[in-house]
Amino acid sequence: MIKKIPFFNYAHVFGQYKNEIQKIILDISERGSFILQQEGINFEKNLSDFTNSKYALGVGNCTDGLLLSIKAAGIRRGDEVIFSSHTFVATASAIYHSGATPIPVECGADHLIDINSIESAITSKTKAIIPTQLNGHVCDMDQILKICKKYNLLLLEDAAQSLGAKFKGKSAGTFGLSGSFSFYPAKVVGCFGDGGGVVTNSKEIYEKIFLTRDHGRAKIGEIVTWGMNSRLDNLQAAILDFKLSKYQLDIKRRREIATMYEEGLNSVKEIVLPRAPDSNKDKYEIYQNYEIEVVNSKMRASFREFLLKNNIGTILQWGGKAVHEFEGLNFNISLPYTEDLMRRSLLIPMNTSLSDEDIMYIIEKIRKYFGYGT
């Protein structure tokens, strides 16, 4: 039988805990408890405890979480917000739809926002920085906080891919005014559809988002401000609450896989691997994704084709383009380092459906392509 390893096995998300998930779905369906009910409250409490933040809110998705956070922070038309161009377009979209101007900057060798590029992009209109905690890795928050203090800037985090990742013992999403998370099905903690969350230590930010996520409604029949519809439904909240309870098992496996990749591929000089687990005591990586670089960009296409022929799925993050490269967004700038990285990088499988045998097979085929044998 030919081995087939998809980039991500969505069926495994359900099958892994089939009985528990079916019970949750049946229970909520039979009770008709669907929107802003106890399951949502429970999940918000557990999310705040998990991140060690004072407040947490469930929202429709991470994009909404970012938009609601930006608006709650008072960022508006005429303001500029700096972000890394190596991110999903949602980061820029949230800034744009708030009325502010998104300012993309370079990423660094760690694929996270480049610290020096932040300072170079600051103008009299700069209001905030939104670093993306990418692939389950956290930026150097000491340096970013130092810049925010120096220039009196707000800090909000796009932690869509990094729930549970840490920098010096502190959770992603808790360094600034707020942090937004994605619960898309492929995430470490993912629901069965779209879902998002926001954490904050600010009562003011919490109260503003609490209102604006539900049409600006304080209670039935009482609209106190302009709002939108971005509510995490009870079914998703209950599933997320269950999956949050299994978080440590998931992360343990991901870090085991990352260690196997490191041990099996670190001698392959034609590729660059992400930081290895525990290589930096200040950081705790959760490996939402495993993004590698091919040193020679001309080899990437044939490398991917070789893996595909051997039934190994890969993807190019964001379709292989940084945000500023999409013509329809009209950024009209060049970020050479990020552009070069996007021509060389790709994601290889990283999820709990993978067996040790699967990982060894992937390692074997990568080594073979670059002429290292087994």
Locations of regions flagged by a protein language model:
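Active-site phosphate-binding strand-loop segment of PLP-dependent enzymes
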Residues: 110-191, 197-199, 347
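Helix C-cap/helix->beta junction micro-motif
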Residues: 98, 150-151, 310
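Hydrophobic/aromatic ligand-binding patch that stacks against planar heteroaromatic rings
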Residues: 93-95, 147, 188, 235
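Conserved PLP-anchoring active-site segment centered on the Schiff-base-forming lysine
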Residues: 67-122, 128-130, 306
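PLP-dependent aminotransferase class I/II
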Residues: 11, 39-46, 50-56, 116, ...
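N-terminal "arm"/small-domain region of PLP-dependent enzymes with the aminotransferase-like
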Residues: 1-33, 349
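Phosphate-binding glycine-rich loop
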Residues: 32-80, 94-98, 103-105, 170
